[in-house]
């Protein structure tokens, strides 16, 4: 399973637009009422989905893929990673107390922790438990963060299991209300994860 994504570097072209452009301008205070209002609006999104380009980069492996994220409830979501031909390389479905992962050979795995499972089976320590919040522009459990000049997350730092993740937001889309991220990068020094969202559908 650790070689699940051996063929995916062929998809590197899909990330040509995935370079980050950190928002410039004066930041705003995390104590501002505008930020609290934005957080409240984002937290009210119980169901949403997004798709786009995914990259995982480390000294051990480089993975490029297309991703699809569907949130159907507070603790219910589905993550798909597909190759350039559109075939599913990984399908992960999570709900409270249960996680199911199906690989590209149809093998099914079950566990109770999505983050531990995907790290163990793919060799990619993706912080899924926090990413569920970060992907929509919320800090989650992070307390060290800053805002851009539109009262949205610009960057954050979060230490988990001895690793400090630095998360930067390269932009937001104006196609949704509230505005949602269009470009996110996670970096802990040894690994980088890039997400470029093509679009959002919110309910």
From Swiss-Prot:
PROSITE patterns: PROKAR_LIPOPROTEIN
Any single Gene Ontology cellular-component annotation: cell outer membrane
Domain of life: Bacteria
GO biological process: lipoprotein localization to outer membrane; protein transport
Residues with lipid group (S-diacylglycerol cysteine): 18
Keyword Metal-binding: no
Lipidation (N-palmitoyl cysteine): 18
Signal peptide location: 1-17
One Pfam family here: LolB
Cellular localisation: Cell outer membrane
Keywords: Cell outer membrane, Chaperone, Lipoprotein, Membrane, Palmitate, Protein transport, Signal, Transport
Topology of this chain in the membrane: Lipid-anchor
Main subcellular location of this protein, as a coarse class: membrane
InterPro entries: LolA/LolB/LppX (IPR029046), OM_lipoprot_LolB (IPR004565)
Subunit structure and binding partners: Monomer.
Entry similarity comment: Belongs to the LolB family.
Function description: Plays a critical role in the incorporation of lipoproteins in the outer membrane after they are released by the LolA protein.
NCBIfam families recorded: lolB (TIGR00548)
Protein name, entry field: Outer-membrane lipoprotein LolB
Organism: Klebsiella pneumoniae (strain 342)
Chain's gene name: lolB
